[in-house]
Amino acid sequence: MSIRSWPREERPRERLIQRGPQALSDAELLAIFLRTGRRGQSAVELARELLAAFSGLRGLLEADRETFAARPGLGDAKYAQMQAALEIARRHLGEQLQRGPTLSSPAQTRTYLAALLRDHPSEVFGGLFLDNRHRVIGFEELFRGTINGASVYPRELVRRALAHNAAAVIVAHNHPSGITEPSAADEALTHRLREALGLVDVRLLDHFVVGDGEPVSLAERGVL
């Protein structure tokens, strides 16, 4: 049954307009993106099928072009639209963070760092550079590794902090496995980075581990 034949108050687009996007299920939001279904299948039914095939939104959003485009109802055009939407969201979050208030708690940076790092299939380490009032100067991806880990060099983080004239740094890396529990190596690295930055009077405010769910703050864990 086509969505157009549904009662108006049950259609995803109308429900979004009336009640906001938070009121919709993943399948309903995806159906709005898809716009149309297939013969004998509404956009919502197609969306449910795709979410099942990709094991949820994350699997769909992280799929490579070949896998994504090969699914009936998707294709290269939809892949391009999806990537554009994701990049718009990332840039919006970045602008929000840069225009926002002084960073004073880990909660203010979680969403932004998760959006930047969560979708990578390999381990990525980055730094968020701040001025002396903890306003954002910029974010840089500094190291990239295999799925087993990234080699992080404290001297490079120090060099980039000095280049930005940063007074403080927040670092983050992802766990491609999705597990956000910091490892002993993560804690040891945090101490090394804090010591290296301290030599040039730059504070390491936090180290986040990004995976499935809420990013974990090592500062909140008492490591910093």
UniProtKB/Swiss-Prot annotation:
Intervals of motif JAMM motif: 173-186
GO molecular function annotation: metal ion binding; metallopeptidase activity
Domain spans labelled MPN: 102-224
Alphabetized UniProt keyword annotations: Hydrolase, Metal-binding, Metalloprotease, Protease, Zinc
Keyword Hydrolase: yes
Highest taxon of the lineage: Bacteria
Residue numbers binding Zn(2+): 173, 175, 186
PROSITE patterns registered for this protein in UniProt: MPN, UPF0758
InterPro entries, alphabetized: MPN, RadC_JAB, RuvA_2-like, UPF0758, UPF0758_CS, UPF0758_N
GO process annotations (BP): proteolysis
One of the Pfam families matching this protein, by short name: RadC
The keyword Acyltransferase belongs to this UniProt entry's keyword annotation: no
Similarity remark: Belongs to the UPF0758 family.
Protein name in the entry: UPF0758 protein Hhal_2301
